[in-house]
């Protein structure tokens, strides 16, 4: 099953389950729903990187989607609640500043982390260097990978499994989970400490 097809299951799950999830979380306070949603999201996202098994990944995407459905809509509701009546539009606009900052730094930080821990091309190049293999220059990533597989008498699928077992790129799930748990913890502290003083 193609990776592009598998990622579409997130949208499918949202179409199927959004009304059910919304009916459950609508009774919850926005921050409680956001904390719960982001926690479930983090677990789901981490699990998608834990295994190569497609069915396992589909279940992990479902977990992620449920968290996304529980947490994301409540962000807008929370902004609407804390904003003064005459400044709701201004607050809504400002609420996208963290998203902008996150997108900028995520590209810089996550790219380096992913490349060092889980990028298939980088892992393959490391494997080539360790084995002392020699390959022609100017190959595309796919052609490079196929040439490496040929030189070690493996199919591309077998080489993928070998790299997965030897270099453990799935360990990046720990980074994803740590970020998610950190975010959830900060929201919890905000709810219990900072937000409590404003009530």
What are these regions, as identified by a protein language model?
Residues 1-13, 55-58, 168-174:
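Loop-to-transmembrane helix entry
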Residues 16-30:
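Helix-to-loop junctions at the C-terminal end of transmembrane segments
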Residues 32-47:
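Structural signature of the two symmetry-related core transmembrane helices
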Residues 55-71:
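Hydrophobic core of transmembrane alpha-helices in multi-pass small-molecule transporters
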Residues 69-84:
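Intracellular juxtamembrane helix-capping segments at the cytosolic ends
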Residues 83-98:
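Loop-to-transmembrane helix entry/capping segments in MFS-fold secondary transporters
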Residues 100-120:
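A gly/Pro-rich, aromatic-decorated transmembrane alpha-helix motif that marks the paired
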Residues 126-134, 166-192:
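Symmetry-related core transmembrane helices of the 12-TM Major Facilitator Superfamily/SLC fold
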């Amino acid at each position: 099953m193609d990776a592009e097809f598998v990622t579409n299951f997130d949208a499918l799950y949202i179409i199927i389950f959004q009304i059910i999830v919304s009916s459950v979380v609508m009774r919850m306070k926005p921050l409680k729903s956001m904390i719960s949603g982001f926690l479930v999201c983090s677990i789901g996202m981490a699990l998608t990187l834990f295994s190569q098994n497609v069915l396992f990944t589909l279940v992990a995407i479902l977990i992620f989607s449920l968290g996304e459905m529980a947490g994301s809509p409540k962000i807008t509701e929370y902004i609407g609640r804390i904003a003064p009546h005459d400044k709701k539009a201004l607050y809504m606009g400002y609420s996208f500043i963290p998203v902008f900052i996150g997108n900028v730094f995520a590209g810089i930080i996550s790219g380096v982390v992913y490349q060092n821990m889980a990028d298939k091309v980088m892992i393959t190049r490391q494997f080539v260097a360790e084995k002392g293999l020699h390959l022609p220059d100017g190959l595309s990533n796919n052609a490079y990978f196929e040439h490496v597989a040929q030189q070690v008498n493996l199919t591309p699928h077998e080489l993928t499994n070998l790299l997965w077992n030897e270099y453990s790129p799935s360990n990046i799930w720990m980074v994803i989970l740590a970020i998610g748990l950190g975010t959830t913890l900060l929201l919890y502290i905000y709810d219990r400490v900072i937000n409590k003083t404003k009530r």
